[in-house]
Amino acid sequence: MQNQQIRIRLKAFDHRLIDQSTQEIVETAKRTGAQVRGPIPLPTRKERFTVLISPHVNKDARDQYEIRTHKRVLDIVQPTDKTVDALMKLDLAAGVEVQISLG
């Protein structure tokens, strides 16, 4: 695995949760002797929803909601076998989506 690179993409609605998860991944990778690039923050996606709160009339009565999706990217350069094993055993928070790709 010397010439490969592992790219880890993280998504979450809570920025504190995603920062904690990236910190755990970085500490685990550095402990096993791999070089880490990142975490690189990607643009936050903001989805806005407008809902009428009146059942029939009063078009002016509306509520607006927003969901923010935070994203981070980590590159692990020159991972060792210990790095891959440690990352597989790592238990991250439930609200974080993790995508791993080898390149």
Curated annotation (Swiss-Prot):
Keywords: Ribonucleoprotein, Ribosomal protein
Stored InterPro entries: Ribosomal_uS10, Ribosomal_uS10_CS, Ribosomal_uS10_dom, Ribosomal_uS10_dom_sf
UniProt KW Ribosomal protein keyword: yes
GO biological process, one term: translation
Any one GO MF annotation of this record: tRNA binding
This protein's record includes keyword Methyltransferase: no
PROSITE patterns documented for this protein: RIBOSOMAL_S10
Record family assignment: Belongs to the universal ribosomal protein uS10 family.
Biological role: Involved in the binding of tRNA to the ribosomes.
Subunit (UniProt): Part of the 30S ribosomal subunit.
Name the UniProt record assigns to this protein: Small ribosomal subunit protein uS10
